[in-house]
């Protein structure tokens, strides 16, 4: 779903940060990413991690869905909608993640997580799963990035 409709106001999430999930399923968002306090954010269950997306990603997906036929459009919107929830960053800079989804991706209360900047969105990984996945993802990303550097 390539989309070039990015502006100076489009959020940019960079770097990796480590943090802990508290007893209320909240994780502190890194200070450089807190501009998103003013933005609508959505959390999406992505198999082995959670993705936190700005509204622009949701709108991009909706434009893609609009290109599909009736039943395909309904199916893809249902699949997306059932794995996505709206979230907010509170005044203390914390994001509450859905407990059931957190547990599905290996995140428990008081456990360590890795927040991974992915430019257009950020990911929340259980620390141990991120360590397992990181080498493969980093190698693939480095190979693809070499085409642009």
Annotate the PLM regions:
Residues 1-24, 32-87, 91-92, 99-149:
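Flexible "stalk/tail and boundary" regions
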């Amino acid at each position: 779903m390539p989309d070039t409709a990015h502006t100076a106001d489009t959020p940019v999430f960079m770097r990796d940060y480590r943090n802990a999930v508290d007893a209320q399923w909240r994780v502190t968002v890194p200070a450089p990413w807190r501009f998103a306090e003013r933005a609508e954010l959505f959390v999406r269950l992505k198999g082995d991690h959670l993705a936190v997306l700005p509204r622009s990603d949701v709108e991009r997906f909706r434009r893609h869905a609009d290109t599909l036929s009736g039943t395909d459009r309904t199916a893809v919107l249902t699949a997306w909608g059932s794995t996505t929830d709206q979230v907010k960053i509170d005044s203390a800079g914390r994001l509450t993640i859905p407990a059931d989804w957190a547990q599905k991706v290996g995140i428990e209360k008081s456990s360590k997580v890795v927040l991974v900047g992915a430019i257009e969105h950020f990911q929340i990984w259980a620390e141990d799963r991120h360590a397992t996945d990181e080498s493969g993802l980093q190698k693939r990303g480095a190979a693809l990035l070499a085409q642009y550097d």
